[in-house]
Amino acid sequence: MVATQIAYYDFTKEQLAERGGSATVRELLNDGTEFRELESKVNLAEEGLKRIMAAKDLELCESIAGSGSRYGDWKILDVKNTNEETGFYAVLLETDSGHAIIAFRGSESKDYNQVLKDWINADFGLLMARDTVQQKNAADYMAEINQKYSYPYYAVTGHSLGGNLAEHAAIAAPDDMRGRIYQAVSFDGPGYSGEYIERNKDLIARVAHPVVHYRWSLIGALLTQPTCAVSRVIQVTEDIRSNTDKEALYMRHGTPFIEWNGGESVVDGTEDLLAFAMGKWSLKVDETVMKKRREKE
């Protein structure tokens, strides 16, 4: 899960260039503005879930940057950022000499531009059975990494829309790379349209290792997961579990509200009624869209 959070930090190619082409996560966090921005969010957040979420984000950042953290030792080798144009952002992390992680950023709602790029063009694009620009970006980035690097083992991951992109990256990876993708994890990412599943069925069948899909909110219940994915409902923390107001239903999707067993493993949960209902609704919408498209052909 840590890699998905690192993908939300605003690291740049310029920062890497200043350090000879790569830098540890700890170096960039300590030299950048992430701490100040997260501290500001805590100070400005209203009491309640927003304050809790902001505090947990800051706590995780401090933990990653800590002197004894193995996550802080990870090297950032590359940043792919077309966030302003398409909403796409991903980082390549080296965890040791033989392993690398490609982490994809998820949906953001910090300003109108990001709402348009992520929630409308990308997330709603999935619901309406449209190919998304960000999915193409993810596939292109996998091809670029495959050309530039030769790690024996890769993992792909992301939260929310980033989880959908991570699954797509595993599905659309170059043939000589897919066998080296030993792990793919989607954290509450939405699924895919029926048209996507049909169009990519041969590639889906060739995914070398099962994709793990953790879900705990209505976002992760949307649309259809491919046959290469194993979906698992996990538990959220007590401070939001029984809260049914509108804000809680939206914020539940955040990774700070995942329940951890000893800080290492997730806990099995049960699907809430809203997620169940929205999942069924999204399938009906997808079926209607496919039917109307075929009528026009």
How would you label these PLM feature ranges?
Residues 157-162, 166:
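Gly/Ala-rich beta-loop-alpha elbow adjacent to hydrolase catalytic centers
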Residues 106-110, 162, 190-193, 220:
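Short loop/turn segments at secondary-structure transitions that flank enzyme active sites
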Residues 96-99, 143-154, 171-297:
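Serine hydrolase/lipase
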